[in-house]
Every structure is written in C-alpha cells, then in structure tokens.
UniProtKB/Swiss-Prot annotation:
Assigned keywords, A-Z: Cleavage on pair of basic residues, Secreted, Signal, Toxin
One example GO MF annotation: toxin activity
Disulfide-bond pairs as recorded: none
GO cellular component annotations of the record: extracellular region
Location in the cell: Secreted
Name this protein carries in UniProt: Conotoxin Vc1
Main subcellular location of this protein, as a coarse class: secreted
Role this protein plays: Probable toxin.
Length: 77
C-alpha cells in the first residue's frame, strides 16, 4: 500500500510538471499585442460564408454518379 501511494504521488507530480510545461504563461508582449479588430472578424466571417456557398453550389451542380453492373450469370448444374 505504501509503494502504490508513492507511485501515485510520483505520477501526479510528473503530470503536473508536464501540464505546466504545456501551457506557458503569457508575458507582457502577448497581453498587449493587437489580435485583430472586430472589422477583421466580420470580413473573415463573410469570406467563410462565401466559400461555403460556393462549395454548396459545386456539390449541387456536380453530375450524379451512376453505376452499371454487368448481368449476373447463374450457372446451375
């Protein structure tokens, strides 16, 4: 029981260490950086909607595929 407790504590410590390395804290440069205006977001949204509409039109105008299967021969002995 004592060994399993130590192993659990070790795994917890390693997990916390890895978690802290995965998400570094933001520094002052990241906090003050301009990430974009609302206008940019609106323009991006419009562009995405346009691309989705074009994709939908391409799918609608695409010819439907059909398959021709050869006749099945059944041989009876």
């Amino acid at each position: 029981m004592r060994t399993s407790g130590r192993l659990l504590l070790l795994c917890l410590a390693v997990g916390l260490l890895l978690e802290s390395q995965a998400h570094p804290n933001a520094d002052a440069g990241d906090a003050t950086r301009d990430v974009g205006s609302d206008r940019t977001s609106v323009e991006l949204s419009k562009m995405l909607k346009g691309w989705q509409a074009e994709k939908g039109q391409r799918k609608a105008s695409a010819p439907k595929k059909f398959y021709v299967y050869p006749p099945v021969r059944r041989s009876f002995y």
